[in-house]
A protein has these predicted regions:
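N-terminal secretory signal peptides that target proteins for export/translocation
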Residues: 1-15
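Intrinsically disordered, low-complexity linker/terminal regions across diverse proteins
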Residues: 38, 236, 242, 274-275, ...
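Short, Gly/Pro- and small/polar-rich lid/capping loops
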Residues: 38-48
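Active-site-surrounding "flap" and adjacent substrate/cofactor-binding loops of secreted or lumenal enzymes
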Residues: 41, 55-59, 63-129
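Hydrophobic/aromatic-rich, well-ordered segments within soluble, folded domains that form packed cores
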Residues: 49-70, 202-220, 588-590
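Noncatalytic, helix-rich "gating/capping" subdomain that lines the substrate-entry/channel surface
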Residues: 100-392
Length: 675
């Protein structure tokens, strides 16, 4: 063990501190100073030192991460900080903010796309004009509600606002969704759009509802809404309560959103007459199919529109339509609202001032900003080495699948075909039309509230276009500079953007086994979703189809149950984290096999591989948020994603000379390999 620790420390000493030369080369000094606005000091490349006081065979996560965790203080704007992901996110935030300010000052190219971004940012940071804009928005909304005198008028307004050019509030959220039969066809997905507190637990708690009503009364008093503020607040809370009680538990909701119920047009119009969906459907293709993740919630909403007092519906409209436009124009209420959220939710402290403006504008226009800066941040980046890693991991998976012993021949062929034919979206969009831009919109540099409506209207216009034509499978619906990767079962496509191709995930100057441990494991994880408990419901074309026999499914479920039981024992929800846990295991195993084909590689290289893998999960969490995370997130904690997976990798025990009885050593017969 002493020799192993010595070799690892030697590797630590030669690890490069600076980022690779290609990264951020053209923006000298961009990251030279700490991100003072967010109270973080971010090194150009974070070093991870081992904790030699920890036995790696008992807790490899602490062995790899402890030294880094001990020297880090979680900022108040974060509830969790993953060193790889959040270092990248913070650096990207700084770069995007600098670009925003440069465009505003005329120091960067002001294309029509960037001009709209700059104007919206200006409208946000100009505090006096923004305050006036917010007050004018309140006046317009109050005047509109004064004109509504009947329930039918209110229902008609809410119906007309669904995916409309007005950008005004509606009770229904409509968006395009993949067809179960053909991924290039879009279905219409409908859900509620105003449940603020969470789900049935929150809407069953009298104390939570009382506090919510108290702050809403403050809102109605602040904007000068007609009627008693307390009554209006109680009315809104009651509407939300009736609909919110139909909200499924978080994991159930996630499953329903993945496989939403399909309903007929006739059912939607007959069962939900007060939503007046014919207004929306008249603007869409007549053969469009409708999906509802939670149809019982839509029925509850329809009943509310029929039974709630007109003044209650008006109050709901005012609150939902104006809640994002009452910060600077109504500072006293804004302060009370911020305090209410801090007391009620476990969310970290929100940014303020220019940082909040930058955060909001970036969220709306990330693709526009990324398109302007990607070549500057990554000059000369080579796609070919990344493609090679993807193909080697893919080849390792296909090879293993074709040798699978428990699947029937037809299912084995389909599993391999899914991986072989998965479409790759790597690094960045290859054509301009594949970027996910908002339609260029006339925005004002001085009217923030109107801009919000115009942006929402532009999103609606874009959604109607997607619903009315064939889906472009080459479109990037995520931002290329985000630290992320994903797999879409409906398209059988894998997305690996530029933003994640940085240390500790990827560095072309690192030994290749280090890159396989980082980005290779991520590639295997995402491709593993193609054949996990959810992705396996779709075939290689993206159609919803059972391609495993019932006997196959029984064996598959038995293997998965072993992972469920394993994570249940450590305090996680094994069933609801199964898809992510199985993808973690798949990713680790196949990344290792791609890095060391035919058992090649030295023990030192293999130890470095496992260290680099663990670094991807090093994180600091606010203890107050752990319980909520475990009850709602489909992922496991970083420590579990490291230690629980390594138990199933015999090569790990060999590399670190672990012995029977060590906590991370399982008997060979107890090690799990699904694929």
């Amino acid at each position: 063990m002493a020799r192993i620790l010595s070799s690892l420390k030697a590797r630590e000493r030669v690890t490069r501190i600076v980022a690779p030369a290609y990264l951020f080369a053209a923006v000298a000094g961009l990251f030279a100073s700490p991100a003072s606005a967010r109270d973080l000091e971010i090194p150009e490349r974070r070093q991870f030192h081992i904790d030699s006081s920890v036995n790696p065979c008992d807790d490899f996560y602490k062995f790899a991460c402890n030294a880094t965790i001990k020297g880090f203080s979680l900022p108040e704007t974060k509830s969790v900080y993953n060193f790889g992901a959040d270092d990248a996110k913070e650096k990207l935030f700084i770069a995007r903010t600098k670009l925003l300010e440069a465009v505003v000052r005329g120091q960067a190219t002001r294309t029509p796309r960037m001009a709209q971004v700059a104007r919206h940012y200006q409208s946000c940071v100009d505090t006096d004009r923004r305050a006036q804009s917010e007050r004018e928005a309140v006046k317009r909304a109050l005047a509109l509600m004064a004109k509504i005198t009947t329930r039918e008028q209110m229902q008609a307004l809410l119906a007309a606002n669904i995916l409309s050019g007005s950008g005004d509030f509606s009770v229904v959220h409509a968006e395009s969704s993949y067809s179960f039969e053909n991924p290039i066809i879009s279905d219409l997905s409908l859900s509620t759009d105003f449940i603020a507190l969470g789900g049935r637990d929150e809407y069953s708690d009298k104390g939570t509802l009382s506090n919510y009503a108290f702050i809403l009364a403050k809102f109605f008093k602040a904007i000068g809404a007609p009627g008693a503020p307390e009554t209006l607040a109680d009315d809104v809370v009651e509407i939300e309560r009736r609909v919110g009680l139909k909200e499924p538990e978080s994991f159930d909701l996630q499953k329903r959103q993945m496989l939403p119920k399909e309903v007929s047009r006739e059912w939607a119009l007959k069962a939900l007459p007060n939503l007046k969906l014919q207004t929306l459907l008249a603007r869409l293709p007549s053969n469009i199919k409708i999906k509802m993740p939670v149809p019982e919630q839509m029925k509850a909403l329809d009943t509310v529109l029929k039974e709630a007092p007109l003044e209650a519906l008006k109050a709901l409209y005012l609150y939902q339509h104006l809640k994002d436009s009452v910060s600077l124009g109504y500072p006293s209420f804004a302060a009370e609202w911020a305090q209410y959220k801090a007391n009620t939710f476990s969310d970290p402290k929100e940014p303020t001032g220019k940082e909040k403006c930058a955060t909001d504008v970036i969220e709306l226009f990330a693709s526009e900003l990324d398109a302007e800066m990607i070549d500057t941040l990554y000059p000369g980046f080579r796609r070919e080495p990344v493609t090679e890693i993807v193909e080697r991991v893919r080849a390792a998976m296909v090879k293993s699948l074709k040798r699978n012993k428990w699947l029937s021949p037809s299912a084995r062929d389909e599993a391999a075909r899914k991986i072989e034919t998965a479409r790759l979206q790597l690094v960045r969009p290859e054509e301009e039309r594949h970027w996910d831009y908002l339609p260029v919109t006339e925005l004002s540099a001085s009217d923030y509230a109107r801009n919000l409506r115009a942006i929402k209207a532009a999103k609606s216009k874009k959604a109607v276009g997607e619903l009315s034509g064939a889906r472009d499978l080459s479109k990037w619906y995520s931002n290329p500079l985000e630290f992320n990767a994903s797999y879409s079962p409906q398209e059988n496509s894998f997305f690996l953007p530029q933003g994640i191709l940085i240390p500790p995930m990827y560095d072309p100057a690192d030994p290749e086994w280090m890159n396989y441990a980082g980005i290779g494991a991520t590639i295997g994880h995402e491709l593993g979703h193609a054949i996990d408990v959810n992705g396996s419901k779709y075939d290689h074309t993206g159609r919803l189809r059972q391609w495993m026999s019932n006997a196959d499914l029984a064996k598959f479920n038995a293997l998965n149950q072993r992972l469920v039981d394993q994570f249940d024992k450590i305090g996680h929800d094994g069933k609801n984290t199964l898809a992510e846990n199985s993808a973690d295991l798949t990713g680790l195993l196949f990344a290792y096999e791609a890095a060391f084909p035919n058992s090649s590689g030295t023990p030192k290289q293999k130890r470095e591989f496992f260290l680099q893998y663990a670094r991807g999960w090093c994180e600091v969490r606010d203890p107050k948020g752990v319980k909520e995370f475990l009850s709602s997130d489909p992922h496991s904690l970083g420590q579990a994603r490291t230690n629980e997976m390594l138990k199933h990798v015999g090569a790990f025990a060999e590399a670190f000379k672990c012995k029977a009885g060590d906590k991370l050593v399982l008997p060979e017969k107890s090690r799990l390999r699904i694929w």
